[in-house]
């Protein structure tokens, strides 16, 4: 059954949550200070979480909290209190992987929907039905499942059971969370949110009779990336996503920047709305996914086994954020906060919530005291700039750069 999926965006901290909400997310997913699979995202303290939920709900956006680590014996005793706190904060759904945590969530956070994490690698309809029978509202499917398999699953599971899939972002070389490379090589547990991503390392060969003598392996001028997955991007295939009966598309990236959360969410929002309304997708919004740092894109496993890509595995970083708009009046008099330096006379681009990207030449700016400023330099510096039109707060000023070669 064709349906328009909700867009679930990453919110690694309060700024990222605000960006995702304002740029068009239907729901955001985040973590508290425990059990959340992303130790290096900002995450939310007990004091911050109710504020985050309140902000999201004021904008009609749902909040999903990850509780998807595999807790050990000494951690389980802390789960009931933690789950009660999440329920009390008004969280809409919990993303769970451990069966014990799933059961406790039903008892201590009964008002929260229970969603099954991709950590469970659900890849067939019998597994999905089993979780539904236990009380799950939604299952997050393994990234390795094809669209054809999803269509079959949709036809063989209860209509009330929702299907969520990843549509954009980094992919794991292993089944999600089931890789032991990080544990073995660095002592950091991927099932506890601490993956060191050794699949992204550069490797060399060593012959056993020549210890200490390393032989480089070359894929390109940077070395080799034997296990380095490309990024997923399904923005050109949202029609197929809708036809498969998927209820929610998820953007990976809680540990990525607020700019990433905003731009990717906004791109999918506009393209999905166009497709759902029967319009041709606006290429300007589709192109926004090229304006964030990313590896070369692929469609993952959605269209079957994709084979291997050997031509390039480097990061693409062709755009840099210069500033964030904090206020702007009807005449285009804007107040901004500096992120990276730029100068009067530079060609810059602005994009914001429901603000179509446009290009302009940076004018002479003014500092907080009103003095002319040719080149703001201090990070987080507040300055003024005249724009040709009003733009919403949380809009970005960016410019084209060439950082890819430095990766």
Task: Go through the PLM ranges and name each one.
Residues 13-16, 34-125:
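Active-site beta->alpha loop and helix N-cap motifs at the rims of alpha/beta catalytic domains
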